[in-house]
Amino acid sequence: MAKLPFDIDLKGKVAVVTGGGGVLCSAFAKTVAQCGAKVAVLDLNQDAAQKVADEIAAEGGEAIAVAADCLSVESLQKAAGEVEKRLGTPDILINGAGGNHPRGTTDDEQLDPAAIGQVKTFFDLDPSGVQFVLNLNYMATLLTTQAFAKNMAGRGGNIINISSMNAFRPLTKIPAYSGAKAAVSNLTQWMAVYFAKAGVRVNAIAPGFFVTNQNRALLFDESGKPTARTDKILRATPMGRFGEAEELTGTLLWLLCDAASGFVTGTVIPVDGGFSAYSGV
């Protein structure tokens, strides 16, 4: 009987995880460390990154915390130099930095002409807010890949971008975020083609609804009761619940395992409890 290919051994690998201080990406960092990789936890918040690195070290793993602004070429180049010096050349890049901004959202789900001037509509979107969201998701992914993937070319590497089910089915109220994540998915496919002959695979994970520090206030009120938005989300999610961060790691590890997914590149994989498959009828 042939040996199963799904043996996740990342010993000797160096992994860089951006947004590593957050709920989802800290789970990614801990998972790859558990499989033997040396991990650079990058975050704009040094303390958040250090907390994750310390937790990895407490479990016997090897990790460093690196403060980095994924929208600054200078900051990223400095971070890349630090990772190279302290851990070695990266083999894995997880582009997890991203997010939304209130100035890129509307108050209404559909336009009521009578409400113009009464609530924040499409016509009130702040261009700087929209641009910030596009930068934070799309440009951060592009710039971070430029900083860390150059030395992968020719020696092999694995890039995992974090998209969203918004990229498949845009949600109401958040046009900037939905558009930005669609751009990340498109960039993932473009990079997969571009890097294919250089031995670098590029894929993306598209999470559905997971409770994070960024969206908690939108999903629950101050008493911890689910908001109306949460009720609508769960009705549209066939599994009827939010995902847990650990439920993303199986897909992550499959994509990182060359024996199991070595012919997989350019994919955007939803992990969303069926949200993107549900028509609502």
Region roles according to the model:
Residues 145, 180:
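Active-site helix of classical SDR
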Residues 241-271, 276:
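C-terminal substrate-recognition "lid" of short-chain dehydrogenase/reductases
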Residues 170-178, 187-192, 218:
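Active-site loop-to-helix junction immediately N-terminal to the catalytic Tyr of the SDR YXXXK motif
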